[in-house]
UniProtKB/Swiss-Prot annotation:
Gene source species: Drosophila willistoni
Protein family according to the UniProt entry: Belongs to the ubiquitin-conjugating enzyme family. UFC1 subfamily.
GO process terms (BP): protein K69-linked ufmylation
A GO CC term assigned to this protein in UniProt: cytoplasm
Name of the molecule in the record: Ubiquitin-fold modifier-conjugating enzyme 1
Active site feature: 116 (glycyl thioester intermediate)
Gene3D superfamilies tied to this protein: Ubiquitin Conjugating Enzyme (3.10.110.10)
Sorted UniProt keywords: Ubl conjugation pathway
Protein function: E2-like enzyme which forms an intermediate with UFM1 via a thioester linkage.
GO MF terms, alphabetically ordered: UFM1 conjugating enzyme activity
Pfam hit, one: UFC1
Highest taxon of source: Eukaryota
Amino acid sequence: MVDDSTRKTLSNIPLLQTRAGPREKDIWVQRLKEEYQALIKYVENNKQSGSDWFRLESNKEGTKWFGKCWYMHNLLKYEFEVEFDIPVTYPTTAPEIAVPELDGKTAKMYRGGKICLTEHFKPLWARNVPKFGIAHAMALGLAPWLAVEIPDLIEKGIISYKEK
């Protein structure tokens, strides 16, 4: 189900141990610490391999996340805002990642720009609670979604390159 490249990426992202969501205030801080450590490691690995593709930050409570992701296509960088909330039932429930500016531009998206992850990602997430976290959601959810959807949207002329 998972190809060698994805397996290698996953093996380099630390697994999380604390089973806590935003409702468990006393141990949520520990879970957030693990989330940040995994994200930092994932971003470092991406930079070292020349595949740096996103930046994220959160509100003080760690319940709202936002940032930018980008996809390179024909040597052009397509950049998008990305956002998601941590569900109250996290980590049992995976975050629903949204790319708001692409809302309504592809069938593989729900209202509000939330990307469709039900068939491939959510069963994998469910088997790996609480070990998977935000870095895993980015690697197994958003990254493959961008890799499939962005070239298709470009080829169909639905999105076009914007000069900076």
